[in-house]
Amino acid sequence: MMAFRAYIINFVILCILVASTVSGYNQKDVKAWCSQTPNPKPCEYFLTHNSNNEPIKSESEFLKISMKLVLDRAILAKTHAFTLGPKCRDTREKAAWEDCIKLYDLTVSKINETMDPNVKCSKLDAQTWLSTALTNLDTCRAGFLELGVTDIVLPLMSNNVSNLLCNTLAINKVPFNYTPPEKDGFPSWVKPGDRKLLQSSTPKDNAVVAKDGSGNFKTIKEAIDAASGSGRFVIYVKQGVYSENLEIRKKNVMLRGDGIGKTIITGSKSVGGGTTTFNSATVAAVGDGFIARGITFRNTAGASNEQAVALRSGSDLSVFYQCSFEAYQDTLYVHSNRQFYRDCDVYGTVDFIFGNAAAVLQNCNIFARRPRSKTNTITAQGRSDPNQNTGIIIHNSRVTAASDLRPVLGSTKTYLGRPWRQYSRTVFMKTSLDSLIDPRGWLEWDGNFALKTLFYAEFQNTGPGASTSGRVTWPGFRVLGSASEASKFTVGTFLAGGSWIPSSVPFTSGL
């Protein structure tokens, strides 16, 4: 009996010792710091169950701890997501699950990037990459919802990572008009040789694609697969129609075509055909630093097949110059990270410029096409957290009717946008709005959803559709009254474009 009591006493002592080693950070400290976040409960739970128990001395230290915490949870969530594959009952569930695996992988990568001591990461960079990580998780959930397969796999996916990401965004929060130090017109990761290459209007090509066999490759995919090294890899795609679905994961790839309507990349995937919006893209730019010039991106699924993306970009610091994007619903998916579009054409019907990037379209032509219903919506911005530094900015552009819409203008309403997510942010500045724009300007998504929390603004637009006298009176809509207000949404400030847009691509930094 004495031996048994000794065993019990030793066991209790061992439990106390083990508990002390995993008791986590000081509970009083944790409560004080976590109370400053939008989601204090998961913050408190995971910190008090962490193996560390040193005092948290500063906000920067709290941010690092929170980053490590969300990274650990994201890795666990990614591992868990892999195990859910066998639970998928059909091809639609499998399609949504496969997207989630990719998106969790990208999420872990982006969080890692913010913490990597070998990667230069300003507060603005961190806010961008954390915003992207949260967008990836939102996109994962959206895939199940849009395919109508939410009852088996989706409930098994935890929201803890999303909540912890929201916390890190709040801790790291960058003032909205934050502008990083000026560089010499290029980002720090572009080497001197690449800078010279990008300054040339006719860059030296690393590979040539031609359908007639006159190049190094007959398909664009073959050329991308051959891309090597960490520097800029320029692929010249000769005139022709290339029926390919491409996911470009390599960094610093440039596709150079012969011009809009000459070099055409086309596909036909769609939600109606059983894929997710995310995976329907004819071309998906994933690797950072992607550049396209003189190319038409097209999805031919048609208006009846619902969402069908021509181009999706999640490439940070990506540039599209003199390109066109052609489809119907969800044409241009500005998914995440920082993106710039100059002298481009965009064609579509419903939500045809959408996503949650920090995206500026400058000097572009936006063509509304004839919809299946009687309603067009140009934008659907997807900002889900108030601290994400994202939004869609249309600057110095033109919004008009495509040729197929003109005969039915009288019976079709076209709106500047509608709020896809709670904190949707869209601005039209110094843009010509033709008479197709409904006097209300903007459309509800679902009743009163997001009308108080969205940020929709207009500044010095022109044309018959530009009058703001009949615009919506939502709390989140405003007409910007001064250049200082509007300048927050220019390329120079919103994208810090002067520090990374290649000098070979013209852009207007201010208003």
Curated annotation (Swiss-Prot):
The UniProt catalytic activity note for this protein reads:
[(1->4)-alpha-D-galacturonosyl methyl ester](n) + n H2O = [(1->4)-alpha-D-galacturonosyl](n) + n methanol + n H(+)
Q: Where is the signal peptide?
A: 1-23
Give the record's glycosylation annotations as residue positions. N112, N160
Where is the segment annotated Pectinesterase 17? Answer: 237-414
InterPro entries in UniProt: Carb-bd_sugar_hydrolysis-dom, Invertase/methylesterase_inhib, Pectin_lyas_fold, Pectin_lyase_fold/virulence, Pectinesterase_Asp_AS, Pectinesterase_cat, Pectinesterase_inhib_dom
Which GO cellular component terms, listed alphabetically, does the Swiss-Prot or TrEMBL entry include? extracellular region
**UniProt keywords, alphabetically:** Aspartyl esterase, Cell wall, Cell wall biogenesis/degradation, Disulfide bond, Glycoprotein, Hydrolase, Secreted, Signal
Main location as per UniProt? secreted
Gene3D superfamilies, alphabetically?
Answer: Invertase/pectin methylesterase inhibitor family protein (1.20.140.40), Single-stranded right-handed beta-helix, Pectin lyase-like (2.160.20.10)
Chain intervals for the UniProt region annotation (Pectinesterase inhibitor 17): 24-171
Question: What's the EC number here?
Answer: 3.1.1.11
Location comes to: Secreted, Cell wall
Query: Which SMART domains does the UniProt record give?
Result: CASH, PMEI
Disulfide pairs here are: C344-C364
Single GO biological process annotation from the record: response to bacterium
Q: Does the keyword Signal apply?
A: yes
UniProt pathway annotation = Glycan metabolism; pectin degradation; 2-dehydro-3-deoxy-D-gluconate from pectin: step 1/5
- Amino acids binding substrate: T277, Q307, R418, W420
User: Any idea which residues are catalytic in this one?
Assistant: D330 (proton donor), D351 (nucleophile)
**What role is this protein assigned?**
Acts in the modification of cell walls via demethylesterification of cell wall pectin.
Q: Which family does it belong to?
A: In the N-terminal section; belongs to the PMEI family. In the C-terminal section; belongs to the pectinesterase family.
Q: What additional remark is attached to this entry? A: The PMEI region may act as an autoinhibitory domain and prevent untimely PME activity during transport.
Q: Which protein are we looking at?
A: Probable pectinesterase/pectinesterase inhibitor 17
